[in-house]
């Protein structure tokens, strides 16, 4: 049941990270250091450590188009964050290590099945990159207080995806 709950987050996180990576690549060609600022804000270990962001560089940035690093960032980082803070209802989802492992294992299988689909639409999404999808993704992983509000995230994200193709 836990794995099923995280599936929508996995889908939207994957699409959001594709869009974010495209946005980073576009901005880094014009503005030096903009990609460093964007990606260091995604590192949950660096939330309260400004020196971590200053020491980061684009060469150290995770490759979000790589499925393995994407799964690691999207699902294991919230688990590490949960060890520090149990606020915002995440602790109720990852109540123990076994449920966390079931969730992450199911999510990895789910994301692997999405890789073929994402390749088909990747070019179109990159042409219409929308960094705000990343905010929806982070809300689903960190800020969400009740899993009943996942429907709001679904509708909002679907609307943004439709905008890609208009």
Curated annotation (Swiss-Prot):
Cellular component terms (Gene Ontology)? membrane
Chain segments annotated as transmembrane: 4-24, 101-121, 146-166
Other remarks on this protein: Partially overlaps NCB2.
Provide the protein name.
Putative uncharacterized protein YDR396W
Key words, A-Z: Membrane, Transmembrane, Transmembrane helix
Q: Does the keyword Transmembrane apply?
A: yes
User: Coiled-coil region(s) at which residues?
Assistant: none
Q: How does it sit in the membrane?
A: Multi-pass membrane protein
From the Swiss-Prot or TrEMBL record, state where the protein is found. Answer: Membrane
